């Protein structure tokens, strides 16, 4: 099991939908989160993309020299940049990070944002662009010189001179809920990502992508994007969930849902359908809470509960085939520690910390009464 954390380049805070308790995005703050994730043994961090965020590639490049082993899942936007240019970017970051780049392919689900970036295409046409883009990108990254003429993209003599460290290219991650997205995942990507839907819905998506990948004679791994609200007791966790949305009023929720309504993302539609813009029935599956999605686009659900319960829910997703968990929590610095401390001991996490010598076996924790070495409880 690989567990990722999240760099909140669109802002952070203690509450949703308000400036109360908010934190600005600064280099020192992002550095704290990245270094905490590195020291705690997270596999990597997701760096989000979109006009609501700082640029993902610039942020990842700033964090790389400040970390030792942390991987960076960074978005590339087909149609916004050329596949050859994107290949150069990816190869350079992979080389300079000593092979710590992972590439998140984002087709985009906001027509207004896409048009602002110069992309005037309908939903399925954007997936055609992404398909052509990845066909070129993968070949260029593998060292080929590519001539290609497609429906939307054309290159002649496309190549890069500095190859990536990870051959044939850094792993490709991708999420999407439409049939077009599933077909593209089957043809091109290494890891298919889903937002945190109830297990039965996730199982259906996994089965469909697996079936399509088998028809392409490929295999695909699977991951899930979730928020987490974990505490030592269930009561404390649910109190924290309610506290997260304590400042939300009906007008803020309605404005957010109206904004989401103009998107043509099937994944966003499915997120909104879980809560229907109402705050009175947010537990949409055992311990799966849709409160985040009242005002946050994209991943809108959180696993809520005590550590044993949340770990059990994660293992249930793992039994469906999920290997990668991309988690987050508010505020992201404190919750990076809480999630690692409460969940990692209860999960089969592939964990290699950067800040602890492999020869350092203890003691861990403050010495008791100046004489007694503390031990972890067996409960």
Swiss-Prot record:
Annotated function: Catalyzes the desulfonation of aliphatic sulfonates.
EC number: 1.14.14.5
Family recorded in the similarity comment: Belongs to the SsuD family.
InterPro entries: Alkanesulphonate_mOase_FMN-dep, Luciferase-like_dom, Luciferase-like_sf, SsuD_RutA_monooxygenase
Organismal lineage: Bacteria, Pseudomonadati, Myxococcota, Polyangia, Polyangiales
NCBIfam families reported in the protein's UniProt record: alk_sulf_monoox, PRK00719.1
Keywords: Flavoprotein, FMN, Monooxygenase, Oxidoreductase
Name of the encoding gene: ssuD
Descriptive protein name: Alkanesulfonate monooxygenase
Biological processes per GO annotation: alkanesulfonate catabolic process
HAMAP family given in the database record: Alkanesulf_monooxygen
Pfam families: Bac_luciferase
GO MF annotation list: alkanesulfonate monooxygenase activity
Organism per entry: Sorangium cellulosum (strain So ce56) (Polyangium cellulosum (strain So ce56))
Reaction(s) catalysed (UniProt annotation): an alkanesulfonate + FMNH2 + O2 = an aldehyde + FMN + sulfite + H2O + 2 H(+)
């Amino acid at each position: 099991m690989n567990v990722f954390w999240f760099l909140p380049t669109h802002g952070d805070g203690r509450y949703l939908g308000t400036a109360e308790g908010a934190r600005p995005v600064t280099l020192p703050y992002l550095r704290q989160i990245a270094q905490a994730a590195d020291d705690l043994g997270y596999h990597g961090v997701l760096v989000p993309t979109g006009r609501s965020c700082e640029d993902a590639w610039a942020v990842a490049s700033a964090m790389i020299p400040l970390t030792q082993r942390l991987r960076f899942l960074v978005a590339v936007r087909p149609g916004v940049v050329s596949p050859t240019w994107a290949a150069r970017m990816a190869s350079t970051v992979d080389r300079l990070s000593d092979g710590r780049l992972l590439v998140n392919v984002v087709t985009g689900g906001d027509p207004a944002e896409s048009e602002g970036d110069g992309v005037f295409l309908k939903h399925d046409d954007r997936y055609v662009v992404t398909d052509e883009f990845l066909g070129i990108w993968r070949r260029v990254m593998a060292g080929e010189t590519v001539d290609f003429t497609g429906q939307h993209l054309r290159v002649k003599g496309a190549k890069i001179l500095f190859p990536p460290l990870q051959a044939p290219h850094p792993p490709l991650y991708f999420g999407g809920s439409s049939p077009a997205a599933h077909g593209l995942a089957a043809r091109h990507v290494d890891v298919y990502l889903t937002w945190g839907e109830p297990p039965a819905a996730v199982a259906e998506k996994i089965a469909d992508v697996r079936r399509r990948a088998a028809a392409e004679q490929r295999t695909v791994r699977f991951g899930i994007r979730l928020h987490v609200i974990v505490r030592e007791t269930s009561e404390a966790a649910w109190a924290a969930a309610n506290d997260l949305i304590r400042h939300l009023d009906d007008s803020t929720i309605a404005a957010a849902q109206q904004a989401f309504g103009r998107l043509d993302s099937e994944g966003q539609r499915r997120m909104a359908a879980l809560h229907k813009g109402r705050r009175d029935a947010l537990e949409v599956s055992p311990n799966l809470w849709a409160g985040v999605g009242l005002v946050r686009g994209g991943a809108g659900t959180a696993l809520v509960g005590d550590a044993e319960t949340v770990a059990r829910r994660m293992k249930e997703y793992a039994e469906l085939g999920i290997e990668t968990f991309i988690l987050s929590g508010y505020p992201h610095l404190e919750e990076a520690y809480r999630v690692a401390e409460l969940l990692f001991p209860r999960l089969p996490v592939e964990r290699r910390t950067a800040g602890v010598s492999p020869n350092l076996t203890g003691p861990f924790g403050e010495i008791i009464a100046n004489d007694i070495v503390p031990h972890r409880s067996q409960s």
